[in-house]
Amino acid sequence: MADVVLRNVRKTYPGGFEAIKGVDFAVGDGQFCVLVGPSGCGKSTLLRMVAGLETITAGEIEIGGRVVNDVEPADRDIAMVFQNYALYPHMTVYNNMAYGLRNRGMAKAEIDARVQEAARILELGPMLIRKPRQLSGGQRQRVAMGRAIVRHPKVFLFDEPLSNLDAKLRVAMRVEIRKLQRRLATTAIYVTHDQLEAMTLADVLVVMNGGQVEQIGSPLDVYAKPATTFVASFIGAPPMNLLTLAHDLRSQLSGAPPEAGILGVRPEDLVIGPGTAAQGGLALDITVEAIERVGPETFVYGVRAGHEARPVVAGKPGEGAGGDVIVRIPGQAAPPVGERITVVAPPHGLHLFSADGRRRIAG
């Protein structure tokens, strides 16, 4: 086991494109860290830099107290699980798991003991003589994890390992990965664009955007107190409502500081009716434009009077902070499309951000 520390890590490609712009964070010994963000944010590039598959332009990466900037991937004592499994199709499951150990010159008895141990942990025993084409997607992913386990690494690295699986299998494998990491107590860094995956797996969540870290914290802290409007709109489904703090809204929030320019409220913190909010709270008149019933809850999509509906764009308050409002209500009862309703939020459900969306002010 080992901690992983990144200090002012940068990556600039030929031509001047800066993919990673001075990233700092630490993953404690035995922690499960998830890097999450949209496509192109730099999360996979950063993971590959930790693995040694991408060079570092500047900064330091430390694993277990050792700076590894110039250390070859095979000598970093890490194991990586890829999105596409990276299994040898002509080899059995047993040989896929044993291959790397044989290349390192490990004794046959030790190889067998490690493969059998991993097969027992992952319930792969009956499949050891099969080849990858005879396995389901979930079974192939377990073999890929088994190949990582047999190395007894200090750090596990996961690069979107579940993205090729169907929704039901993703949930099952997500649970299995978390159980496995806790059982082995090995430090892990996991990359995903799926915020639900990130929230359920992480001890430490690192939200990335444009090659930079937007926020670091526990999943619940990041959800409850997003540092920027990007985090507010990216973490959470449906996303946080972001509204420009114009005069009509500011007049309801007597304590709002003058530097606040955007008001945020989670869909679940809005309640339909009554017509007035509690002292310090918020009341909005909206016209219902769409309803989504998803079983135990319903999403009501509306637009404020005098505003046009606009798509919410994560991290771009000028485009996303408009008149659109999403309300999350329990059950299936909902007002009809076209009806004008009032929704209210209590003071503790309100979040204030700077006008550029880069700074949390209150809430």
UniProtKB/Swiss-Prot annotation:
Residues 4-235 form the ABC transporter domain. SMART domains: AAA. It holds the Pfam family ABC_tran. InterPro entries: AAA+_ATPase, ABC_transporter-like_ATP-bd, ABC_transporter-like_CS, ABC_transpr_MalK-like, ABC_transpr_MalK/UgpC-like, Mo/tungstate-bd_C_term_dom, NA-bd_OB-fold, P-loop_NTPase. It is an enzyme of class 7 (translocase). SUPFAM superfamilies: MOP-like, P-loop containing nucleoside triphosphate hydrolases. Its main location: membrane. It is found in: Cell inner membrane. One of its GO terms (cellular component) is ATP-binding cassette (ABC) transporter complex, substrate-binding subunit-containing. Gene3D superfamilies: 2.40.50.100, Nucleic acid-binding proteins (2.40.50.140), P-loop containing nucleotide triphosphate hydrolases (3.40.50.300). It catalyses: sn-glycerol 3-phosphate(out) + ATP + H2O = sn-glycerol 3-phosphate(in) + ADP + phosphate + H(+). Keywords: ATP-binding, Cell inner membrane, Cell membrane, Membrane, Nucleotide-binding, Sugar transport, Translocase, Transport. GO terms for molecular function: ABC-type glycerol-3-phosphate transporter activity; ATP binding; ATP hydrolysis activity. The keyword Cell inner membrane applies. GO terms for biological process: carbohydrate transport; glycerophosphodiester transmembrane transport. Belongs to the ABC transporter superfamily. sn-glycerol-3-phosphate importer (TC 3.A.1.1.3) family. Part of the ABC transporter complex UgpBAEC involved in sn-glycerol-3-phosphate (G3P) import. Responsible for energy coupling to the transport system. This is sn-glycerol-3-phosphate import ATP-binding protein UgpC. The gene is ugpC.
